[in-house]
């Protein structure tokens, strides 16, 4: 924002003063080098300018990841041993690395690889040499053929043929494969119904992002409720110092995990409070964030979707929808905006990878 602030947009008077100096780069010379190029990072002035923001954000990231790691330790036994979730996505790397599984001797595997490689080669040649015929397998928009009201309210409706997606789909349980396309069609029918009834004049109707947010929160609540006995025993053991839990084979002791969560959460709270966010909003923000994290991790462990985006439905977006932005105030809105980078979408959310790593270690008898 410091780069693009102008007298016309009035950013300087509106919110720039609320951005912490220790988390941002303001030096015009350094910013010019970053945006325009023809410069180098390796000067004393540039390195010192970047040092504080990089170190501070690194501290924040490490605390965030550490809390997730401790949380996965608490969840692991309940989901892996008690509920016996399948972790569909760990099977492929385990089979690839196993000497006992004749993975690369499967003729159907090589036939599938040959088809995918042939398609990619043809498409690549078509891009480089347009005279080579290409295959019409990407982004056929059905909306181009549906022009009658209210059916044309479906909007962009792509049909694509991606071999890698078909291969990953083979790893997914049938109920997830079904729900993936069913709810896509259901969403499009919601748009048609809204157009038919005239509800499409309502901004953002039918509130798909909010529906998705509610679904993830529901998955989180279900996961916590189904493991309530296990989690209560962990808390009892933490507060009393004794219990019947056997955590000798866990990645870390349960008491250590709970204590680590508390310490990591304290670091996050102090950090964000220093940024300028109100105390109550800090707990709401991270409560929503970690609830979404648990929901995403549960879905990945049980069903294994390779992508779990949640655009515009993280706490940085949901909170201003639930609470009047004018009541939140500029300082809180600025800090929420600075949290956008790890809440834009959750396709590469680290917590599922952490739990899948524990599952792979268990299957491979590591640790």
State where each predicted segment sits.
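Transmembrane-helix bundle segments that line or gate the permeation/cavity pathway
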Residues: 1-351
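Long hydrophobic segments that form regular secondary structure
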Residues: 360-367
